[in-house]
C-alpha cells in the first residue's frame, strides 16, 4: 500500500510540473506561389539554406535547384542540366524520350558536395548522378547507372554515396 501511494504521489508531482497552456504566435502567414510545377520534391540542408529539387516532367533545362532560408520563400538558383545529350534518343529531331523529362530527383549534401540522383522516364532507363560544390553553379555528371524508380540517396560517413530503390525490369 505504501509503495502504491508513493507511486501515485510521484506521478502527481510530475504532472503538476507540466504546463497546461499552449504557446501560440499570432500573425498572418502566406505561402507565396512558385510559378512552377513542383512534384516529387526532395529537400536537403547545407548551412543556413535549404535546397529543393523536383521532377520536371517534359521541361528543359531540367532538375531545377531552389534555395530558401525559411522553407517558404524559394528562389531557383540553377538547373542540374540544360539538356540530356549522352543518348541520341534525347535529341529533339526523331528523339523518343526527350519530352518525358526527369523524374523523382533526390538531392543531398555531404562533405562539402551536393549530389542529385534522378531518372528519365523512358527507355534507355538509366539513372543519372550529378554533383556540384556550389548548387548555384555548374553541375557535373558523376555517373550513369542502372535505372532506379523513385530512388533516394542515402549518404554515410564511410561512403561517397549510396542509393536505395526498387529496380525496374
What are these regions (language model features)?
Residues 1-4:
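Positively charged n-region of N-terminal signal peptides that target proteins for export
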Residues 7-16:
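Bacterial N-terminal signal peptides
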Residues 18-169:
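Carbohydrate-active catalytic/glycan-binding domains of CAZyme proteins
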